[in-house]
């Protein structure tokens, strides 16, 4: 019996992750949103080539959009040209939009994407975090705590 072919494409699971967001911000709440993508964007995203490091969510005409999310052009398609950093509409219910807009209105809060993933049905979803910026000393404390946890686990393992 032949083995199934491994294509390297992501059918479900995390396609891109914003690792800096959890370090630079304190995440207060998370919301999962759908995202409007064209065919070539989905194919490029399934290859795991998106970047969320500079991305943020904002409001335009009463709707939520994701700005500065980089999805490179899909190499397999000739006619599929799209703006690699263009705004992408987020699919949210009105109550969720109002919650996010209220968070943006508060001073010091922003909405950042934490990851882009495909759900079991194969639909692209974005996990948004309502975040507040961390001060430099908070970042240092987080690093010290993480290092201590790592050292503690190493010590307990070697007992």
Swiss-Prot record:
SUPFAM superfamilies: Small protein B (SmpB)
Places the protein is found: Cytoplasm
Bilayer-crossing regions: none
Function according to Swiss-Prot or TrEMBL: Required for rescue of stalled ribosomes mediated by trans-translation. Binds to transfer-messenger RNA (tmRNA), required for stable association of tmRNA with ribosomes. tmRNA and SmpB together mimic tRNA shape, replacing the anticodon stem-loop with SmpB. tmRNA is encoded by the ssrA gene; the 2 termini fold to resemble tRNA(Ala) and it encodes a 'tag peptide', a short internal open reading frame. During trans-translation Ala-aminoacylated tmRNA acts like a tRNA, entering the A-site of stalled ribosomes, displacing the stalled mRNA.
GO function term, MF aspect, one: RNA binding
Pfam families, per the entry: SmpB
A GO cellular component entry from the record: cytosol
UniProt entry keywords in alphabetical sequence: Cytoplasm, RNA-binding
Family per record: Belongs to the SmpB family.
Protein name as it appears in the record: SsrA-binding protein
UniProt record, GO biological process: trans-translation
InterPro entries: SmpB (IPR023620), SsrA-bd_prot (IPR000037), SsrA-bd_prot_CS (IPR020081)
Main location class: cytoplasm
HAMAP family referenced in this protein's UniProt entry, alphabetically: SmpB
């Amino acid at each position: 019996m032949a083995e199934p072919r491994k294509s390297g494409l992501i059918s479900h699971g995390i396609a891109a992750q914003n690792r800096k967001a959890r370090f630079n911000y304190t995440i207060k709440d998370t919301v999962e949103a759908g995202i409007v993508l064209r065919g070539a964007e989905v194919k490029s995203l399934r290859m795991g080539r998106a970047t969320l490091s500079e991305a943020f969510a904002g409001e335009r005409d009463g709707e939520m959009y994701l700005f500065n999310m980089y999805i490179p052009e899909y190499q397999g398609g000739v006619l599929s040209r799209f703006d690699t950093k263009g705004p992408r509409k987020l699919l949210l219910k009105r109550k969720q939009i109002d919650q996010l807009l209220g968070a943006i209105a508060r001073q010091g809060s922003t909405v950042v994407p934490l990851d882009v993933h495909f759900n079991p049905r194969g639909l692209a979803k974005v996990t948004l975090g309502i975040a507040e910026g961390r001060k430099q000393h908070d970042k240092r404390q987080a690093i010290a705590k993480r290092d201590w946890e790592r050292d503690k686990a190493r010590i307990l393992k070697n007992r």
